[in-house]
Amino acid sequence: MTPLVVVPQFFGSLVFDRATSRYYPFDRDATDVLEALVHTPASTVVERHSDPDAALDLVRRLDPLSFLRPDGRLAGVRLDAVPPDDHLLGPLAVHVEVIAQCNLRCTHCFADPLPRGGRDALTLLELDGLFRELASLGSFRLGLTGGEPLLRKDLLDVLDAATDAGLHPCLTTNGFFLSDELARELGRRDLVWLNVSLDGATAATHDAVRGTGTFDTVVERLRHVGDLARFTLAFTITSDNAHEVDRCVSLAEELGAHTAVFRPVYPTGAALNRPELMPTYETYQRALRTIAALSNDDDSSCAHVPLPGRAMDSFSPQARARTAGRVVQGDGCGAANTVCSVSVDGQVNPCSFLGSRFESASIRERSFREIWNDGWSFRKLRSIDSESFRGGCRARALASGGSVHARDPWEREWRRSRMESPSRTLEVLIDD
């Protein structure tokens, strides 16, 4: 497979870099140059361009990214597809639920109560077809979730099907069944990223939501995993553990994690029954500022976890505001714009946090492309009136305001804090 894929979009294109699993947005003029570079050396493209100086400037910017071959051509191909007029050809990331069963009963889980009976899981053959369709849409980033994915007996075959299709899968697990042997198998699959959930730096905070003894079990499993497979520790920030995020970073370093991710608990699924776990906006911001203070970067506008060369992904409102405007039209929420989810039995939803009532249709009945383009819930979220709405998480808006058209209270507080003290606003890096 080529290192790069140029994915045509309504605004120009997105270039997917397989080496970093990142998308880079380009406008129409830059896209014209990129498409010419697929078959023609840079020197010739610049010479023939109507604005040689602009073309040369773009070429110079591409070089440090290692986008060009030694002969000056782009190190990639253009995806053969025609994008829609008002939304992405395909989501930047798709979260696929590969199993509904789980060994834990986490009280803050985004999923509906588990196990969920009556849902016939997608077969390996069906998943393979889905993965290939996602690749044809330029949707290369894949999250495999559950339930607990490690309980699926053919999981390694599922991962192989995903990588064979050209996707970059990330496997999210509670880590309970993570053996050295399994970690070694995952490590052999170069494109697989292991995402292990922890919800605190101590057994007291973690076990309070995941069950007695789970912290010690998972930490023990992870002590040798870093030598066998690259993994990230994913921390869910709640009102109970926000005070110990600095110790969470230290724990991630101690266990050899390659990345640490901090996200707030969302008011969805089982978490709807634990409203006391929801951090306030200010509590979450204090946690982010604590993480930012640990940064080795002199730029105070960015928050980094001091793990080897990796950036913290905070999922904060300001991070969404910084990135969403580049590639989507509308409110800036990722649901139906840059991400979506597929349930264990193939139901496609703009975001799993919205719950099953927002499932549009099943891939057993319609193609993923059709659902992404014209599913009723996708159309609903994309049609939100931008004159009366100013952004934020649709799941939080649904929980607090009773509608996806309501306003996310965190977005309101974020805008208020910017007006009151713009210099204190924390900007963070985000991986889409």
Pin down the residues of each PLM region.
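N-terminal pre-core extensions flanking Radical SAM catalytic domains
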Residues: 1-114, 135, 410-414, 418, ...
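Radical SAM enzyme [4Fe-4S]-AdoMet core and its adjacent flexible, acidic
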Residues: 2-6, 192, 197-199, 204-334, ...
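Short, charged low-complexity linear segments at domain edges
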Residues: 72-90, 309-322, 359-380, 385
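Flexible mid-to-C-terminal extensions adjoining Fe-S/redox cofactors in radical SAM and related proteins
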Residues: 347-432
